[in-house]
Amino acid sequence: PGMQAFIRKFVNLQQNEFLDGSQILLLGELNCADLQQQSQNADVATLRSLCAEIDLRLEPVLLAIFEAGLTPIVIGGGHNNSLPLLSALAKNQQQAVNCINLDPHADFRLLEGRHSGNGFSYAHHAGYLQHYFVLGLHELKNSAATLAQLQQAGAEYCSYQRIFVRQELSYQQALEQCIDVVVQGDGDIGIEVDTDSISLMPVSAFTNCGISVQSAEQFVYQLARLPRSRYLHLAEAAPAQHPSGLSAGLNEAGQVLCALVFAFIQGKQHQAQAI
């Protein structure tokens, strides 16, 4: 649904001095209809097995995209797809990569079978993910076990409460802090956005206590300017979750996804020479 919402809006944007459509390739979507069918009334073990099957289907597609020298913009779909993105990029680079995730949840939960809450912990355990930073983590939406695992992995975060409630630092200072972490070493960088982080966005975990669309655009733009950032992943859009129904959700999700994609494209157009 996120992809359909995006396409409806994106194809109606203008080509002008700010956007060159000839540099954009639309590749389509991964067909998971058979897995979706099998998931009906399935138990937890089966659902986790089906999620792992998505990993196996998606990784070779992404690896081919990276090996072609292209920069994928992946519109989900769940945040489980972070694992095949990171594994494909790491295999393309033949080394562990770094990642910054704008997300109220760290998605660093236990290795208990695959689901959308443990893509990054699986990637770290497999040696695909080195430096990991979570921006906007919500202090009460992550278990003690998750926070302990983050610390053990050497991952870092700057919480939503620290920035917006206690105001210990500005949002721009937090962005600079996360950039300092993910530019360490020489590994490529993945840009992850869980759209659950955005207030009133129709998503799988709807919130009115999140960041603005503008703050998310600012995040994407500044990370896209890094020469080593290699992909953008926009996860968890769910138009049907809009309080006013699917039609309103498609409209709103499409607008937000387009804004974030354009921020990424502009960031790449204005890419810094070397960081």
Predicted regions and their residues:
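Catalytic cores of soluble, metal-dependent hydrolases
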Residues: 1-73, 81-82, 91-95, 149, ...
